[in-house]
Regions:
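Sec-dependent, cleavable N-terminal signal peptides
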Residues: 1-2, 622
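Tryptophan-rich substrate-binding surfaces of secreted polymer-degrading and adhesive proteins
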Residues: 2-233, 434, 511, 516-525, ...
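Conserved, function-critical positions that sit in or immediately flank catalytic
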Residues: 190-622
Length: 622
């Protein structure tokens, strides 16, 4: 019994984490308030502003209860470290106790990441196949231009497993490049078919890229034009079996597949139209067509009635016409009279720029009646062997399909046909939504990058001393109830005079304090470490502290404090006076030990400087 965890499960897990960074309740509440105010006016409800506020409050309460939002922060901690961190409760709490500063993270700081593979000539790339585990296929490539922008392509056809020798073109709408209707790029040299997916700007890549991955564009999550044009179509039709030279009676002229023909269709320049008529001399619609051919040397035409039905008359402007009847009408066997089913005018067939071929008809079933049908035709080589299936229209709204080669009576009546193994075709259906509609699912993106910057130019990020750890925390609590976009968590003691000579960075500030409780008066030592000390040049010194700790309340009181080289040192500085602890001591806003640490890392001490910026990047790979 097989048990398989699909790539969808991994992607869904990634989606859930990504979506948890997206907070929309405030927008929903605001939109509701706007709609309520409009309805109040148009329906003459006479609700006061206060009543509308109360009603909106009900909605906000329900949103908070039924759709709780998460807040994420990347925080820096610990000016030094005694050991490498480990995944233990002690280490996580030690990080939370020693938080120094942090930034709030939103969905703008998060990117889906995908594996980037640079296109390399001579590589055999996998083409999309709905019977294969697509997460294991090497079918996505990256092309990088001179500006450093990255263009992502998906292989739809690989020329029956041939090597790719021509890079997909990044130009949209240019002849031989990306078709602006389908966003497919067809290589005329190696017969590869590529689907343009999206591009990644150089600036985005510089911020989020890793050694082997690039970020999905935000907020479009792909290319909006490609996504809107995507259809649930036939991706390709594979030939799983076909007899050699099956269509030898249908090879006219040179009978070769030219490398300069981007459609990969049979070149047969000697097929021309001798005459085009309607049902009557005055009928403008084409009906009866006389085709002049040059038979391949040594070959012959089948003179039987309707021998060339079940073929298409192909026209180089992307049209095919079903041949209803056929008759070989000349003694030399170079003329075929056919009737076709079309609403096109006779004039459209006499355009001098038109070229024509007779090609095998491929019939593809439909999943639903409302979708556009797939119109496909066969490509034969100079021997008349079916080698490829090409398309006029790949159709839409396909979930499942079968494909069948329609045989002209002249082919099926040939000697020895009954002993041949029948041609077998397999229709490959595009993913749900169509190629390019959902890059996250199509590329099995189960990796997220979370980015923030700590800059010395930011007002709330310290521009001195060190930090040795960073972590991503979910739902930390702040003392004042806010959710700041950035915070400095250092405690600050303001004292009179210039005390910078006493407040030595790295030393400890201690104070013995008395506490009254149910067991009488108890004492504790409040200890913190000096992060920096700044004299304002006139009256006061601000002493910035980290690692504030004590047995009970962890707060300084009005009175003297002392600076020591270590907390237990007998030797202390001259006393420094806190005149009014209520006003002169300010503690960090982050409530210690709150928030769930999802990821944390330690490193050698990083020095904070005013002209320095550190980029912090977490990669989550599911």
């Amino acid at each position: 019994m097989a048990k398989i965890i699909t790539e969808n499960f991994k992607v869904e897990t990634t989606n859930e984490l990504f979506n948890s960074f997206v907070n929309t309740n405030a927008t929903v509440g605001s939109n509701f308030a706007t709609s309520l105010a409009t309805y109040n006016t148009t329906s003459s409800l006479s609700l006061s502003s206060a009543q509308q506020t109360v009603i909106k409050g009900f909605v906000d309460t329900q949103l908070a209860s039924l759709k709780p939002e998460s807040d994420y922060y990347i925080m820096g901690s610990s000016i030094d470290k005694a050991n490498n961190i480990s995944n233990t409760q002690h280490e996580k709490r030690d990080f939370q106790r020693r938080v120094i500063f942090g930034n709030k993270i939103t969905d703008d700081d998060v990117r889906y990441m995908f594996k980037s593979t640079t296109w390399t000539s001579g590589t055999i790339y996998d083409d999309f196949d709905d019977t294969q585990d697509v997460s294991l296929l090497n079918m996505f490539v990256t092309i990088t231009n001179s500006e450093g922008n990255h263009y992502i392509f998906k292989c739809l056809e690989n020329n029956n497993g041939g090597p790719s020798t021509v890079a997909p073109s990044i130009n949209v709408g240019v002849a031989g490049s990306v078709d602006p209707n389908t966003y497919e790029s067809v290589s005329s040299s190696d017969s590869y078919v590529w689907k343009y997916m999206f591009s990644v700007t150089n600036s985005d890549a510089q911020i989020y890229s890793t050694s082997d991955s690039l970020p999905l564009p935000y907020p479009a999550y792909g290319d909006s034009l490609v996504k809107s044009a995507a259809k649930e179509s036939i991706s390709q039709v594979l030939i799983t079996n076909t007899p050699n030279s099956l269509f030898s009676k249908c090879v006219f002229g040179p009978g070769t597949v030219t490398s300069s023909d981007p459609t990969g269709t049979l070149t047969s320049s000697t097929v021309t139209l001798e005459a085009v008529t309607g049902d009557s001399p005055t009928d403008p619609i084409a009906k009866n067509i006389r085709i002049k051919i040059s038979p391949k040397p040594g070959a012959f035409l089948d003179t039987a009635s309707n021998a060339y039905t079940n073929l298409y008359l192909w026209r180089n402007d992307g049209e095919v016409y079903d041949i209803i009847t056929s008759t070989v009408s000349s003694a030399t066997g170079d003329l075929i009279d056919v009737t076709i089913d079309t609403t096109h005018t006779k004039a459209s067939f006499t355009n001098g720029a038109r070229t024509y071929m007779l090609v095998p008809k491929i019939e593809v079933s439909r999943s639903v009646s409302t979708g556009n049908p797939c119109i496909a035709y066969g490509v034969i080589d100079r021997f008349g062997t079916l080698v490829k299936v090409s398309f006029i229209d790949k159709g839409s709204k396909y979930k499942y399909a079968t494909a069948e080669l329609k045989l002209p009576p002249g082919v099926s009546a040939a000697s020895g046909f009954a002993s041949l193994t029948p041609t077998a075709l397999r229709a490959v259906v595009s993913p749900t939504g169509g190629h390019g509609s959902n890059p996250v699912n199509e590329m099995s993106m189960s990796r997220l990058a979370v980015i923030t910057n700590f800059s010395g130019e930011d007002l709330l990020i310290p521009d001195s001393n060190f930090y040795t750890k960073v972590a991503l925390l979910k739902n930390p609590i702040f003392v004042d109830g806010t959710k700041p976009t950035q915070f400095d968590n250092r405690a600050v003691i303001t004292v009179a005079g210039d005390k910078t000579s006493l407040a030595i960075v790295g030393h400890y500030v201690t104070q013995e304090v008395s506490l009254s409780g149910g067991n009488g008066t108890e004492s504790e030592t409040v200890v913190s470490r000096i992060h920096s000390a700044v004299y304002d040049g006139s009256s006061n010194t601000k002493i910035y502290l980290v690692d504030v700790s004590g047995n009970f309340q962890n707060i300084y009181q009005t009175g003297n404090i002392f600076v020591r080289a270590n907390p237990n040192s007998v030797t202390a500085s001259s006393p420094i006076s806190i005149n009014n602890a209520s006003n002169d001591v300010v503690y960090g806003n982050y409530s210690p030990y709150t928030g769930e640490i999802l990821h944390f890392v330690d490193f050698d001490p990083i020095q904070r400087q005013q002209d320095r910026k550190e980029k912090i990047k977490f990669i989550f790979d599911f």
